[in-house]
């Protein structure tokens, strides 16, 4: 995949927290990268104890998502761990998601709880009672095809049988919808049924209403038609207190490779049985390949005779380089939006787009946490991101040190001011726990790709 602008080997780590031992202090799970053991950190009188069992047996997986929830309805928290990344064969069991049951405080892997028809790289996992039977179900989003970036992935719906085992279904309306990075489960239309909001790379913000045993896509109807983005994250809350969920959605920002009106074309351009992805920028109404001549010819050697000179290639559009029929038969996607934003409900299933401040658009937003950090009764946003694994000619997304946006006391706006967290690195997840030494202090735990976990007092 020589033509890809970035690598996709830094999806994690994931952090999840819950007070597992009922001591009033949040415990947390940190997922490991490929070759690293995941751990639970359990609070005790002297700090935290690291628990590695039973996660050692799955250290060859890359744990990209994790959720504490009561899977078997026995009153304690079990753990769902999603495996992803691109460093695996699509025939590898290391891509399998896992359920660990909490048995009197000891987590045990349950190999019979989950069943999938094939292996895939998970990009998103969320829980909610989809069928209103009182048991928590799981929605899983496929991140990408591990062999070919660009092929759209699907949603899997795991229905809880009530005993912590799950029946997997693949709704046809949720098949091949995109390269999914995050999911929010909430009731959009106040009908007491859980709906799903799906975001991903080269995807529209996709709102699916849970309607009569099918999922109805309503994004265009509620004002989200032109929202194709490189979305990385989504969280929901009710910021304007109207009883309707609002959303914070993280994108790649305005300071890097991805631009509005950008496209990609996916096809077997050299007829060798393998798909290639060609990216273009739109300039004066025409689409131009972004790849330099040498890298394009290395991937597609038959173009060498056609692209003899650099100066000629520099003015050639995608239609000059490739045959019209080949382009028409390609799977194509385009971008409308690269800014991170807030979707604020306006009632009647419609949303207003509010863009985050310019400084936050300097880099990507991969991690979002919503918390009243300063205890003023207003919801604050904690944001983090960056993506270093971009080709040098395009430049890394490295201008963010994380942000706190403080909720406003002014009813005319959502947030008053913001300040940097001063955390350097590729932030992929956040968790908030109480400070062991101070009951009114909050500790932010930041999961940094290819780096140590960072803790920071945010209150």
Feature annotation, model-predicted:
Residues 1-459:
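Beta-propeller-forming repeat regions
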